Amino acid sequence: MSGTGQSDDPRELKAGGSLQGRVKVPGDKSISHRSLLFGAIAEGTTTIDGLLPAEDPLSTAACLRAMGVSISPITDGGIVTVEGVGVDGLQEPAEVLDCGNSGTTMRLMLGLLAGRDGRHFVLDGDASLRRRPMRRVGQPLASMGAEVRGRDGGNLAPLAVQGRQLKGTVIGTPVASAQVKSALLLAALTAESPTTVIEPAQSRDHSERMLKAFGADLTVGGEIGRHISVRPGATLQGKNVVVPGDISSAAFWLVAGALIPGADLTIENVGLNPTRTGILEVLEQMGALIEVLNPRDVAGEPVGDLRVTHGPLKPFNFGEEIMPSLVDEVPILSVAACFCEGESRISGASELRVKETDRLAVMARQLKAMGADIDEHEDGMTIRGGRPLKGAALDSETDHRVAMSLGVAAMLADGNSSLARSEAAAVSYPSFWDELERLRC
């Protein structure tokens, strides 16, 4: 498994044992990105408690600093302060803005920068990000008058953005994508007239909740499709943001706790935004034993502690209708399916083919190496579970969610495994491997 550009030896993953205890997962990645972005274009100071100190939000912070925004050092457990420059105060940077591995950073930056009239920006990223499609953001922005250029007709980074005075419009997004929607809402803040974004189904709504909290003139409605309207001209005001734990990171513990004999885990302070809880719906459908403890509301976002204990699971079948609320959880659910007696089916998941990796192909390939019975389809997979997985030489193929999913699978295998490029987990959960050891019993 060479050619990774990494010198790290494969991580040894021991089979067997159980997991018990309490765990706090890192701050929600979506909310971390947005609190930095909205704080940067607000007036005054924004404080962020619980910001995820992982590679993707660090990329967003680095881009904002390059445009004159003062952001305090981002450390684990520290409070981050952002000194806002106002809705049109971002400076033209002297260097290329490096988005690292973060598709969220690049897509939201396109919306943020498209309306900076008279300023020029270049966005780039790592080899993986340079392969990810960006036209899905650039094309609707163009209907507002934005100018985005790049390889493959503006689809692939590096991307050049020439800031323009944008015009408000009504835009339908072809897919329910929080990143596309959020980019358009950011662009709408400095347009000449109101903008309405219509999405075919609801995607994650962190941007709407948070922009309203920061003071944007934003309304949500619509009978057919979901309409989000922004009237430009409002001044955003700095806020104190408390970032809940990321349910996409909690998902690894939820599935591990449900699958592993003797497991009893409590995951503290997890964001339970209804646009993100598809994983809980599917685990409920499977018969998993999950309790929501101490439900509460923190800064407009529902939060709770989740307790999961081991029990028998049934196979599942889910598709397009629930996909926006669990798109990042498909890799770990594919692991769960391997241990359910019977056939599980995932469909409507073609979006996973353009994530950090082709996640459908990578999960099928790696689980098959452990002996799983999987058929891959264009938009999903069929998994016939109930046969034991065996330890194997595995590879995250540089994908953080694949790395952690395989870490759970390896605990349940017959025989030990090794995992190449396990350090990919740091993109969203830097302490994952340490926590796995701590909870092990």
UniProtKB/Swiss-Prot annotation:
What biological processes does GO assign it? amino acid biosynthetic process; aromatic amino acid family biosynthetic process; chorismate biosynthetic process
Q: Which residues bind 3-phosphoshikimate?
A: 29-30, 34, 177, 179, 328, 355
EC numbers, comma separated: 2.5.1.19
Pathway recorded for this protein: Metabolic intermediate biosynthesis; chorismate biosynthesis; chorismate from D-erythrose 4-phosphate and phosphoenolpyruvate: step 6/7
- Which GO cellular component does the record give, naming just one? cytoplasm
What residues bind phosphoenolpyruvate, as annotated?
Answer: 29, 103, 132, 179, 359, 401
Q: Which GO terms describe its molecular function?
A: 3-phosphoshikimate 1-carboxyvinyltransferase activity
Q: Can you state which reaction this protein catalyses?
A: 3-phosphoshikimate + phosphoenolpyruvate = 5-O-(1-carboxyvinyl)-3-phosphoshikimate + phosphate
Q: What is its main location?
A: cytoplasm
Renumbered residue ranges of the record's region Disordered: 1-24
Keyword Amino-acid biosynthesis in the entry? The reply is: yes
One Pfam short name: EPSP_synthase
Q: Which domain of life is it from?
A: Bacteria
Instruction: Kindly list the places in or outside the cell where this protein is found, as annotated in its UniProt entry.
Output: Cytoplasm
Instruction: Please tell me whether the keyword Cytoplasm is annotated for this protein.
Output: yes
- Identify the enzyme class: transferase
**What residues form the catalytic site here?**
328 (proton acceptor)
Q: Which UniProt keywords apply?
A: Amino-acid biosynthesis, Aromatic amino acid biosynthesis, Cytoplasm, Transferase
Q: Which family does it belong to?
A: Belongs to the EPSP synthase family.
Q: Which PANTHER family match?
A: AROM/DEHYDROQUINATE SYNTHASE, PENTAFUNCTIONAL AROM POLYPEPTIDE
**Which proteins does it associate with, and in what oligomeric form?**
Monomer.
Question: What NCBIfam families does this protein map onto?
Answer: aroA
Q: What does this protein do?
A: Catalyzes the transfer of the enolpyruvyl moiety of phosphoenolpyruvate (PEP) to the 5-hydroxyl of shikimate-3-phosphate (S3P) to produce enolpyruvyl shikimate-3-phosphate and inorganic phosphate.
Q: What protein is this chain from?
A: 3-phosphoshikimate 1-carboxyvinyltransferase
Q: Which gene encodes it?
A: aroA
